[in-house]
Amino acid sequence: MATRANVPEQVRGAPLVDGLKIQNKNGAVKSRRALGDIGNLVSVPGVQGGKAQPPINRPITRSFRAQLLANAQLERKPINGDNKVPALGPKRQPLAARNPEAQRAVQKKNLVVKQQTKPVEVIETKKEVTKKEVAMSPKNKKVTYSSVLSARSKAACGIVNKPKIIDIDESDKDNHLAAVEYVDDMYSFYKEVEKESQPKMYMHIQTEMNEKMRAILIDWLLEVHIKFELNLETLYLTVNIIDRFLSVKAVPKRELQLVGISALLIASKYEEIWPPQVNDLVYVTDNAYSSRQILVMEKAILGNLEWYLTVPTQYVFLVRFIKASMSDPEMENMVHFLAELGMMHYDTLTFCPSMLAASAVYTARCSLNKSPAWTDTLQFHTGYTESEIMDCSKLLAFLHSRCGESRLRAVYKKYSKAENGGVAMVSPAKSLLSAAADWKKPVSS
């Protein structure tokens, strides 16, 4: 078994030994220089002038190596006549001596590059300019000739006095049942087709009935409507069905009530969830008609109307126009009171349903002293100006002033109750009554 050579231990604090004598397997002593930094490929002394140089952390490229050599040559220059240069290690023939082109390249690379410190740029954050500062700046206060001319042209075209239209559907944008995206198109369509379902003046073809008998029938139907607690849509559709049927077929006097109760049955089936039973309708007629007679008349009405029941009644427009009026409960009750009051009278058939609804809103605003009586929003959504609805509004104001004296008091009793705001007790619009004093009966269209 081979013996291990004893290597003397190095005393702490003693200088490093330049060479170590190591015996190989044959016992021969081999001297070699102690290794320094393994990664130091350049023979640069570890300490120069007693100061330790910082380690090189960047990769040594050709240009960086040339710079290191140049710095080393500058440090080896004699100081105070001392021509001795410290040895950096074993001498090697430089590459530049063997290749003249490489020598010139090294000379170019040996140029000392002085790092120039860039001036520090101070970047100041701009202050946010508020709207008040912009408005108060003197530049914005200057009035140019072009701005004056443009302002005059806008005033001449009426752009300055542009009407203020309130978005009445703003609160219903999240309500999918309101159909806000289509509501304007729907009411434009209603106004186009309302003429098709508008009843014509028919008293000239009725030989056994007159206007007063029609008013008595509708007054009685209003009481039945209240008795069964039906919706307002049912009432307006019932009157529409009666007038349309009477405009195409002459009815004897004894069957007029039968036409009315059958029309109420049709409208209830169309609008109500739980329509009244036929036997209940027979009871309210005091058994004047049988169930079979009501069903036969129902079929006759549907046949003459060609089953056309989806019509824009006055109630369809009332809902929209009341919303455009920004109404309170008192205002809403007053509008319905005037609309139902006008529905009882035959003279209102000369006006289309949308005009009757708009006139009811206008007359109600005048009766409750709302200012202004007709707004830009109402004109936009109704499609009527104040002058266009004036004749119909005068008629409604005239009927309002006479309702307390009439024997047909179903509408008056209904809207005299506290649950409906007692709006029937409100005085009619004086501004419209003065003009309604010389009101003339409308000419049949």
UniProtKB/Swiss-Prot annotation:
**What is one GO biological process annotated to this record?**
cell division
Give the InterPro entries listed for this entry: Cyclin, Cyclin-like_dom, Cyclin-like_sf, Cyclin_A/B-like, Cyclin_C-dom, Cyclin_N, Cyclins_cyclin-box
Protein keywords: Cell cycle, Cell division, Cyclin, Mitosis
- Which tissues is this protein detected in according to the database? Expressed in roots, stems and flowers.
Keyword Cell cycle found:
yes
Please name the GO terms that the record assigns under molecular function: cyclin-dependent protein serine/threonine kinase regulator activity
UniProt lists the family membership as follows:
Belongs to the cyclin family. Cyclin AB subfamily.
- Pfam families according to UniProt: Cyclin_C, Cyclin_N
Q: How does it assemble?
A: Interacts with FZR2/CCS52A1, FZR1/CCS52A2 and FZR3/CCS52B.
Of the GO CC terms on this record, one is: cytoplasm
What does induction of this protein depend on?
Answer: Transiently down-regulated by salt stress in roots.
Q: What does this protein do?
A: May induce mitotic cell division.
Q: Which PANTHER family match?
A: CYCLINS (PTHR10177)
Do you know which CDD domains this protein is assigned to? CYCLIN_AtCycB-like_rpt1 (cd20567), CYCLIN_AtCycB-like_rpt2 (cd20511)
Q: What is this protein called?
A: Cyclin-B1-2
Native source species: Arabidopsis thaliana (Mouse-ear cress)
The disulfides recorded in the entry are: none
